[in-house]
A protein has these predicted regions:
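Non-catalytic interaction-recognition regions
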Residues: 1-447
């Protein structure tokens, strides 16, 4: 996954992080070796904005009344500790210095502080990455130049002039400029795309090329988790990665999973902004209120490219309309029954099970096929959907005992049937535990 290192994680980042981590868990369960990687976007202009924002907080920590944070800078309180740390380290050495003297230094210190915060935020969700790749380090190592040279050799990058923007009058200062262009029209794009800007800096697309050029060297398959707002660039990056890997004699499958933002509600009303971030509710604030497992499972109750609402009241509601509660309640209900039964589960008399029990067996027995299909499709939400259906089937079986005492799991006058039903229930619980483990969620035994 990736997120700009300019502040704490918010719920849009959260959904992508959970989807990515759950996908990794799913692929590992299916037998793949997986490397979890975080791409640090630390080479763009937003990092300069971060450094300038940190400099404001640095001056504040030195006792200056900075007033309101100017528009265009990051206003959140999360930068106050960064400013205090800078003041402790450098004193007033850069308080009145020219920006050229401190910008690069403050960039480095600020990004390091933000990544420390981001790692801590992700840890709250049980997410730990194996590798962190820095965009700035890739550029310092001339990886973009290597990718460009490779693509030029294959005839996929050339020097050309972009057409004026279509459908509207071009800006007054627009003029045709020769740029290195990737032949993305050969792969279904509507125009060839520049990999460099007119000032010589790499475009986002050019930087992404370099990252994937390196990434593909050590992988048999690549999967990116992107925000849905980047959907327009998927086709061209897929084309570029295909060109890079096929040109190297290795056709590395590459997939991009798009994740929609999350709308936060409380009792149906939009949640106000966070003072800590200045603009959004942070992931840490959400996890602190409702818990890691609720957040993780809820993020997987819809397809990632579908819009999602996260209502603080509903996700902790003890109701069958709350999929998190309904699933955990099924698991806890089974364990409560096992504790109270006074009989050990047994598989010696499974022929005593009737049609209703066998229907539950068939539901649970789908699990291996669901895992295989979900892994093949790279869709961890299928596991969450399956678990919801299994929980509903178990609750239906349980409720049948309320109407007909002969359908209750525990039959005091028939220990053989009780043992068989307990065995069935214990296997349903095991499937629930396994499914939740894939998704990085802990199954509870008491509620």
């Amino acid at each position: 996954m990736t997120a700009n290192p300019t502040g704490p994680m918010h719920m849009g980042h959260c959904r992508g992080a959970v989807v990515g981590d759950a996908l990794c868990g799913l692929l590992e369960w299916a037998g793949y070796r997986v490397v979890r990687e975080y791409y640090v976007n630390d080479a763009g202009g937003q990092v300069d904005v971060l450094a300038r924002s940190a400099h404001m907080r640095y001056r504040e920590a030195l006792g200056e009344d900075i007033g309101a944070i100017p528009e265009g800078l990051y206003p959140g309180d999360y930068l106050k500790p960064v400013g205090e740390r800078l003041a402790q380290e450098f004193g007033d050495a850069y308080k009145d210095a020219d920006e050229s003297e401190w910008l690069e230094l403050f960039r480095h210190r600020s990004v390091a502080a933000m990544m420390e915060m981001i790692r801590a935020d992700l840890a709250l969700l049980g997410i730990h990455h194996d590798l962190f790749s820095s965009e700035a380090e890739l550029q310092a190592a001339k990886k973009p130049e290597a990718a460009e040279a490779w693509l030029r050799e294959k005839g996929l990058v050339y020097d050309g002039v972009l057409e004026a923007p279509k459908g509207k009058a071009p800006p007054e200062d627009w003029e045709p400029v020769e740029l290195p262009l990737f032949r993305s029209t050969e792969f279904g794009d509507d125009q060839d795309r520049p990999i460099k800007k007119s000032n010589g800096a790499w475009t986002y697309f050019g930087a992404d090329l370099a990252y994937h050029f390196q990434k593909a060297e050590n992988a048999d398959a690549l999967i990116d988790i992107w925000g849905a707002d980047h959907a327009g660039t998927v086709k061209r990056i897929r084309a570029a990665v295909a060109a890079l890997t096929k040109g190297a004699g290795r056709d590395v499958p590459f997939d991009v999973k798009l994740v929609q933002m999350v709308k936060l509600l409380r009792d149906g009303e939009p949640v106000k902004m966070s003072k800590r971030s200045g603009t959004f509710v942070t992931l840490a604030e959400v996890v602190e209120e409702v818990g890691k497992d609720v957040v993780r499972f809820t993020m997987l109750t819809r397809k990632p490219d579908a819009q999602m609402e996260f209502d603080f009241a509903k996700v902790v509601e003890a109701s069958k309309d709350n999929p998190v509660f309904y699933l955990q309640y099924a698991h806890a209900r089974i364990h409560s029954t096992l504790r109270k039964a006074g009989v050990e589960p047994g598989s010696d008399n499974l022929d005593r099970l009737g049609a209703d029990e066998l229907a539950l067996v068939r539901e649970a027995a789908q699990f291996p096929r669901v895992v295989e299909a979900a892994a093949k499709a790279r869709e961890p939400h299928r596991i969450a959907f399956f678990l919801g259906d299994l929980a509903a089937a178990f609750h239906s079986f349980w409720n049948a005992g309320n109407d007909d005492p002969a359908m209750r799991i525990i039959q005091e006058s028939d220990p053989e049937l009780t043992a068989a039903r307990l065995f069935l229930a214990s296997q349903v619980a095991q499937v629930i535990r396994n499914g939740l483990a894939i998704l990085g969620v802990e199954a509870v035994e008491e509620m």
